[in-house]
């Protein structure tokens, strides 16, 4: 029976599906059982892990402060508490919402699969984190305390909540105990660290994949909440940092303010010094105008840059103009007040004179003046001015001829000395009528009274008041003019002094080393100076420091020249000496000098640029300022001349050390002291007028009654003694008053200014105190007065010039001036000491504050270290617990993974068994169904598929020879067993191909079943034998464009249609109608072998309808390992006139060729197996003539050995069969095919060809038309 393939495939699919369903159901049952077991184990593990986590996290929860601290301000407290309560309520609501969300999430969760084992742990962790988070938010909102500790006030802290973080700066005055502060700091730091660690751990777990549960829509966003916590903490930390930064900034600002204040003070002091210097200069100018020569030794000013000097000069000028304007205004006001006072005094005097006009003095006594008492009174006044103790106090000043009751009071003004002059000038003498004595009263510290005793006779004439007033007015005008002139002179002198100072700065006094006190060369090699570095081209570097002139430093002028010298020690450089004594060399011209105190120096200080002369001698270059350096660098910039070399013979440096400067200052002070002592020894004592000498004067009669006056001494009196008149007394009193004004009253102002100068200079330069004091001593010493009498013994004459009085004044010295100078010195020292004490107090305060700050910082640092040491143990414990918990968790996870692995292995083994069973079942089914596909039926009406009737391997056989080892071709002609039998089989060649009936039957079904061939002799494999039509069948081939009609006597006609394997012929001729099918039958070709490609090159088998001869030569060469014989089977086909094919079988067989055991069929069609087993080259030829020749050549070489000469093979490469076919005619035409004729005779002398060894490639050449061919390659894989 015929079984359809579709049904078989359908049955196989059903079987496979049923087996799969059975196995799948079994696996599900196993998984459900395992899941029930694992759920219990997992629940237990999760519960244990959750308990462990809660235990660990309980220690890490936020620690609440022990006490709730209060704030001082009640209003702020209430607000903060309300805010905290509101925050708590909000947090509770949030917690409730979170719990609801968690419940919803738990309800919405899908059932847990066996593979999502860690999902349970995730859910547990989420629950735990949410609960912990809700607690932590409440704790944070209520109990987080952020401390803002300032360096100045460490006990001040700020307590704020999350709602009042922005108000942290407002509550700086809240105070909490130190212990509580420490506890709170520790708790806050620990809480911050714990929250950060938790967030880090969560992020790490997310990165590792421990928590992989998908977030639902209702699930709380944990990451955002964690970020909120971080933000809160960061805000607190930022506020702390900001407060600390603010504190530091405030401190820095305070320090800067203090520095600025100090700078301002220094500037003020400098300005005051400049003012005082100006005042001194002005007063000196006044003294010069008054012919009182005062020598002032100015201090050496420190060198300053020109710009600063110019600015200071401008400022000074501006200030001077302002001061002058102020002084003028003050003078005008004073003049007005003085005029009013004068008018008032004149009225009083006029009244008194009218009363006393009746009384006149007749007798006059000599006036005795105690200069010592006057000096005492003046010194008292000066002391009062210097000490400035009597502010707004009245000082009684009386003239030598004043009454006790008539005193004038004037206010104290130290800055304006002209007021005193004007007040004294405005005073008029008043006469005591009773006693005829003029008393001069003054207030002393000792309470001594200074009296001027006078014996004046009364006169009847009274002075004219109008004349006096006019004279006074004229005097005042003269004084004003003098003052104006003095001011102009002062301004001119100031300008001159400024110009002189500028010139002194530009012009240096020091020109050579001889001008220096120390002429030592500090750049000599003898004291240890060295040349440290020079330019590379320099030769004999150390020669410039030597003393000999024959040695020199040599350089080329074109190269850059420079050298660095280390001096013996650090000095104040003043003079530099350079010299070049070599002739026929260029001279250095311009050079620069640089200095530094370190070597190698990062930067050099510019000292100056100098130009030398073109002379062979020593040249000195003086620095503008004295600079203190140890290392000097000299760079030569240019030179004189065009010579090749520029030598330098010597280099010397002159200056002074600090010790030398101090010694010089000490020496100067000592010399000044010696001078002072000499001056003291040469001071004469003052003499009283009229004590030792007597003098007489002649009176100048101004009126009708004139008298003579005499000033008798204590010893002798002149006989011609006459009393002076009133006018003479008045003139004498005026002269005395002028002398007092010029010589005694003005110098104290100078003293004051000098004292102030000393004090200010001592603030700036303490080293120059001695110089200043000594200079002031000289100034003070020259201010004392000595009165000498004329040769006549009388008072000084009025005709004496100011120059003579000034010269006399310089010769006088008083013993009290020495004590005054000493007192001034002591005051200056005390003042300096007080300033030094204040400075030291400031330094002590500054350093004490710094030490306190350092102590505070150190204590904080130590406290931090202690806290860290205490917290390290706790952290170690926490880390150990954390590590233990992690170890436990990992061990549990490892166990779970092991269980998973075991389960997977079990599943794998089950799957293996399943697939083995399936494969075995499929094999069994295939074996069972194989016979259905391979078995053939014996019915004659069996339908066969399309065959290849015109295949080149299709050969006709006419005889039944069972012993033919080659290809047996027979036709119905000769032979008793003549019948047209067409059978196909495989011939076993050397045991490589097996002969089987199945192959034969399959091949017959595929190729040879449609021709109605009958064989009347043999029945082979179900072939019907018909004896009726033997030797009487004639084959007529009619070709009709793609169809083959086979006519036989049995009137068997069959139409063969082309199938899908037939090549479509395109270029067909009218003679050719048969199209070539594929070389292989569809049933004979395995599915792995590719089919010949569809191509246009179709082979035309041309058969002549006129019964032309078809010469088919089948040459088969079988080469065996034994090279002794050659087996050639030549089949020569001759077409007779009777349309019969004569096949001569010449078979030369030897021992190597074994006949098959089964009967050999009469025709052979080569199968694919045969083709693949034998490497082959198949050539199809079509010459396009009336007759075509088809030749198949198969060659096989069994071994790689060289063929012997007896082996003949036919070359099949591109040969045409026209005239090449070898026709071997045998006389014997037996059906057995055994003949011993000329079987090995070949025509055309074809040479033997050696074929290559067996390979897997076969070449297919298709020739068509006029030598057109195409080559196809096909690789066989069988």
Swiss-Prot record:
Coiled coil (residue ranges): 177-349, 464-509, 883-914
Pfam families: Sad1_UNC
Boundaries of every SUN domain copy: 501-658
PROSITE patterns registered for this protein in UniProt: SUN (PS51469)
Glycosites: 47, 56, 166, 293, 356, 370, 386, 391, 405, 558, 669, 832, 941, 969, 983, 994, 999, 1005, 1028, 1036, 1041, 1049, 1107, 1138, 1147, 1214, 1227, 1241, 1267
Residue ranges crossing the lipid bilayer per the database entry: 914-934
Gene Ontology CC terms: cytoplasm; membrane; nuclear membrane; nucleus; vacuole
Gene Ontology process terms (BP): culmination involved in sorocarp development; mitotic cytokinesis
InterPro entries tied to this protein: Galactose-bd-like_sf, Suco/Slp1-like, SUN_dom
Biased composition (Basic and acidic residues): 261-289, 347-362, 406-415
Residues in the signal sequence: 1-25
Keyword Signal found: yes
SUPFAM superfamilies reported for this sequence: Galactose-binding domain-like (SSF49785)
Subcellular location: Nucleus membrane
Biased composition (Low complexity): 76-110, 304-317, 327-346, 416-426, 691-721, 752-780, 797-807, 1218-1245
Free-text domain note: The SUN domain may play a role in nuclear anchoring.
Name assigned to this protein: SUN domain-containing protein 2
